[in-house]
Amino acid sequence: MIKNFIAVILTMLTCLSCNSQQASSGNSANDDVYTTRSGKQVSFTFIKHASLEIKYDGLSIQIDPVQKLPPETDYSRFGKADFIFVTHEHFDHFDKDAIAALSNEQTKVVLNKRCADMLGSDYEFLKQYDEVSAMSNGESMKLRDDISVDAVPAYNITPDRTQFHPKGRDNGYVLDLDGLRIYIAGDTEDIPEMAQLSGIDIAFLPCNQPYTMTPEQLANAAKMFSPKVVYPYHYSETPVEQINDLLKDSGIEVRIRAMK
């Protein structure tokens, strides 16, 4: 009995040690981790809907941070961001308070021109450091020797949806982190410009009607540029599980995470 008791205690201590190591690594159970060409880790934290955190080389990169959209997010637990990217002006993507909570004088905020205009004088503290950059479709920016971003089109093409995301207003982004290419599509349908994307490792594609894509459109979009991994996101109640079947035998891995 004593031997059994000791064995139980040792097992518990081992589990506690493992849990401590996981916590100290900074990666939660909600993170997916990839490796760049030089062996650096890139991790993704799936916050909700269209909001992500990407961690790379000690940097925090926030995508479309939004506080109030349910479930409400406490961005203070993430610390200050090094980079914030905003795709467009809609409430589930653009949140001035979230940007303020995540920003300090070192934070670089990149958004489309409409959102830059909407920041307004209340957020002048961001502009005084010259750390707010408005990008338009087709523009590129070098953020560091090993980090660059391209602003790419994101818009609706179905006739009765074009008012939601008109062509030329909103951005998608292609982030290059030490050669790992990540496509954040923003709110878009399967537009022809997607066929021009190249070397995409990871793609986040939206999937909800009437604002973005159906599962069938998403599958068609993915086949246009063949990323290694596709994450459906921004999907609300859309049955995204069917994307697995739609992309079966395509060579594209589908990963579904909690991004309603």
What do these predicted ranges mean?
Residues 69-70, 90-94, 116-119, 139-142, ...:
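Active-site environment of divalent metal-dependent phosphoester hydrolases
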Residues 36-43, 55-61, 140-150, 176-182:
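Beta-strand-turn-beta hairpins that frame and shape the catalytic cleft
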Residues 2, 6-57, 249-250:
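Zn-dependent metallo-beta-lactamase
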Residues 30-37, 47, 51-89, 93-100, ...:
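Pre-active-site segment of Zn-dependent metallo-hydrolases
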Residues 72-140:
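Active-site HxH/HxHxD metal-binding segment of metal-dependent hydrolases
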Residues 123-147, 219, 223-260:
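Binuclear metal-ion centers of metallo-dependent hydrolases, dominated by the metallo-beta-lactamase
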Residues 62-65, 81-92, 110-113, 183-186, ...:
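Active-site neighborhood of phospho(di)ester-bond hydrolases with catalytic His/Asp-centered motifs
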Residues 75, 155-223:
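Active-site-proximal loop/helix segments of hydrolase catalytic cores
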